[in-house]
Amino acid sequence: MNTKLNVKGYLNVGDNHQLYYWTQGNPNGKPVLYIHGGPGSGTDEGCLKYFDLETTWIILLDQRGCGKSKTNDIFYENNTDKLVSDFEILRQKLNIKNWTLFGGSWGSALALVYAIKHPQVVDKIFLRALFLAREKDWSEALMGLGKMFYPYEHQRFMDSIPKAYQNSYEQIVNYCYDQFQNGDESTKEKLAKAWVDWESTLLSPINKIHSTATDFKLVEKLALLECHYAVNKSFLDENFILDNISVLKNKSIYLAHGRFDLICPLYQPLALKQAFPELQLYVTNNAGHSGSDANNLATIKHLLKTYL
């Protein structure tokens, strides 16, 4: 019997935001909230590749300003507290008492923030490519190890920024943020494409990955929202996750992290492991940031099959 369910709809969360959500899998199975990354990437069918849809009910939501969600202003009331609140609104709408969280990269940070604020409704937490969402983590993602491994690609990104604004991470992101909000369309498009191309370069040291978004609006959303959250330091206290992770001392947290992750280097999961010794950390060899790297994908599937 086919137990898969495909439900789609829009969630009115106020603030002129209508959020697209959909479910896949077995509605009688274990509910798992899939929290996408970026910020700004949205969800698609590829997000389902980690899961057994015969035993799991996957709930997916395009965050504010992302994917198929609707708004007249992607920046308005778009912050971490609001995203966390949106997950709660969705959980209540779907009449889910408790659910498991799955998040990668930015989605891993959101999963931990949500769990810290709502531990009573969280069963287990599965993460990949941990991002702690501190200012130094944003700086590392944009201006860290990657430029040493891919100097020519990094220079192409820098060429999209006037030399007067290239002296520091702060100058770069503030220039980009100003242009994304106030620049002419030509400058905005050039800058957004350069931002996403640079990030795509860093996704995998194993498989060369290029930006596959042919719709400029999708590229623009990713660049604008990543910059928005970077400039605003994730709308979190600098060490919010590490300072509050002890709230989850009775929760099982599983993390698969690529050894060669150039966007979220290994120092971040090691910091979480130090603050939360109960963390089940699996460092995947010959893998980077991408969840599609073979060893990352195999490890994530193993963790979900074994411990979910």
Curated annotation (Swiss-Prot):
Catalytic activity entry: Release of N-terminal proline from a peptide
EC number(s) reported in the record:
3.4.11.5
What is this enzyme's class at the first EC digit? hydrolase
* Pfam assignment, any one: Abhydrolase_1
Q: Which GO terms describe its molecular function?
A: aminopeptidase activity
> Which coarse location class applies to the principal site listed for this UniProt protein?
cytoplasm
Q: Name one GO biological process term.
A: proteolysis
Domain (AB hydrolase-1) spans: 30-290
InterPro entries in UniProt: AB_hydrolase_1, AB_hydrolase_fold, Peptidase_S33, Pro_iminopeptidase
Instruction: Name the keywords, alphabetized.
Output: Aminopeptidase, Cytoplasm, Hydrolase, Protease
The residues responsible for catalysis, as annotated, are 105 (nucleophile), 261, 289 (proton donor)
Query: By its UniProt entry, which SUPFAM superfamilies does this protein fall under?
Result: alpha/beta-Hydrolases (SSF53474)
The places in or outside the cell where this protein is found are: Cytoplasm
A GO cellular component term found in this entry reads: cytoplasm
User: Which Gene3D superfamilies does the protein's record reference?
Assistant: alpha/beta hydrolase
Q: What does this protein do?
A: Specifically catalyzes the removal of N-terminal proline residues from peptides.
Similarity section: Belongs to the peptidase S33 family.
Please report the name of this protein according to its UniProt entry: Putative proline iminopeptidase
Q: Which organism is it from?
A: Mycoplasma genitalium (strain ATCC 33530 / DSM 19775 / NCTC 10195 / G37) (Mycoplasmoides genitalium)
**The organism's taxonomic lineage, starting at the top:** Bacteria, Bacillati, Mycoplasmatota, Mycoplasmoidales, Mycoplasmoidaceae
